[in-house]
Amino acid sequence: MTHVFLHAFPFDERMWGRRYGTAPSLYRLGPSIDVWAQRIATEVDGPIVAVGASMGGYCAQRLLAHGDVRAFVLVGSRADADTPERRQAREETIRLIQTEGVEALWEKQRPALFPEDADEDVVARARAIALEQDPEELATGVAAMRDRLDSTALVRETEAPVLVARGEHDPFLSAEEAQALAAAARNGRTHTFAGCGHLPSLERPDEFDRVLEEFLDGV
């Protein structure tokens, strides 16, 4: 099985650091998350284990419709489509990127990505990756998230085991929402990373690797 690691916004595949497997740069795969999933499914030979953080989790879920997914991990990621309010927020984010640039985007998003007491080196590394992104590609990513399809039915119908993980202080996915998503799946479970924000794979890489290994050992 090929392990496919799908990155969060506004980063790229480097956020996964030393992890093994395939880690594509999503923005360059096309204009929509479904196109991303189709491209990945076409390029990966054989069964897939998909590990997606935030935006990458949206892609992991769409892979259920296009590829042979044997297990998947969603980190800080939800299954429903954007509400009108979230779509409006995406539009504002696109305008921010286009008018003020990537650094302004980072300054706006940083408080939601990491808790105040997050390790400064971790935050600095994340910032460095974010600031190297192409503004047009980031805008494409935001539009893809805005227009993504609801994946609830895919999660509910698949036989593939799913781990729904989140940081304790993640503002984008509550504990109740994570539990509900895992409960909707036929074989779902949850894990909460204590003290973390939206990106536990960056804040707690050793714990993340251990949790991932334990989950996959049980698949």
PLM regions and their residue ranges:
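Conserved HGGG/HGGXW glycine-rich cap/lid loop of the alpha/beta-hydrolase fold
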Residues: 1-34, 38-39
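Gly/Ala-rich beta-loop-alpha elbow adjacent to hydrolase catalytic centers
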Residues: 52, 56, 60
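Flexible "cap/lid" loop of the alpha/beta hydrolase fold
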Residues: 61, 65-107
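Conserved alpha/beta-hydrolase catalytic His-Asp/Glu region
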Residues: 82-85, 100-157
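Short beta-strand/loop motif that positions the catalytic acidic residue
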Residues: 158, 164-166, 170
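Conserved alpha/beta-hydrolase "acid-adjacent" motif
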Residues: 171-177
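Catalytic histidine neighborhood in serine/cysteine hydrolases
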Residues: 183-198
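Catalytic histidine-centered segment of alpha/beta-hydrolase-like enzymes
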Residues: 196-209
